[in-house]
Amino acid sequence: SRGIGRMIAAGFLKQGARVYICARKAAECDATAAELSALGPCCSLPGDVSTAAGIQSLVERFRAQESQLDILVNNAGAAWGAAFADFPEAGWDKVVDLNMKTPFFLTQALHKDLLAGAATGHAANVINIASIDGVSVNPMETYSYAASKAGLIHLTRRMALRLARDGIIVTAIAPGAFASDMNRDARDHADTVAQRIPLGRVGVDDDMAGAAIYLASRAGDYVVGSTLVVDGGVTHARS
């Protein structure tokens, strides 16, 4: 309901899609859905997808309203930063559970719905939101975040191989600096962050929405298991 998820939701709405958004905080999820409804039909399905029970609840409420799913964007995520000597087990458990396990189990739970979407003549799509920190090394001590996003990129490949036979295309987006609550530097110090980006600016809504629309559209139907890096060139500058 915020940040990158909101950018993608708005982009899909502008293309005529009916969009369901999910977030743990019901009030925020409802408010965002109400705001985005100015662009098209946007429905709020608040819930906690970090648990099996939360995923099942979300799926049941979705199925009460829809008989198929055309596009699933796995965007829920968490980060944790701490010095190497102090990095706690909780910082691994929370981040890996949400960043790697949740995309797998949510896709698994919605497999039947995606199959129904694929049966309409156009492939269904699963888009996992990874990070450039899973592609190249960030100097910040976010050990579990970097490892989980690298794992999600590889999981995207593995899932893509299995689900392609079902007419379900799995891809990923690896965002760079986009203003969000998770990336507060890009949100609060965009000019400073932009100095480290070859393109000279942080990402904007249309950059992220355009990437997701491409992958979910007919133009992206032959892109299977790939990760689209959307970062203004940062990954190459790190290399």
Q: Model-predicted segments: where are they?
A:
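Canonical Rossmann dinucleotide-binding motif of NAD(H)/NADP(H)-dependent dehydrogenases/reductases
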Residues: 1-20
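Substrate-binding pocket helix/loop in short-chain dehydrogenase/reductase
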Residues: 83-84, 88-96, 193
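Short, small/polar-rich loop/turn modules that mediate ligand/substrate recognition or access, typified
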Residues: 164, 169, 223-225
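Alpha-helical segment proximal to the catalytic Tyr-Lys
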Residues: 112, 161-162, 221
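Short C-terminal tail/terminal secondary-structure segment
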Residues: 213, 224-239
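Residue(s) in the substrate-gating loop at a strand-loop-helix junction
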Residues: 131
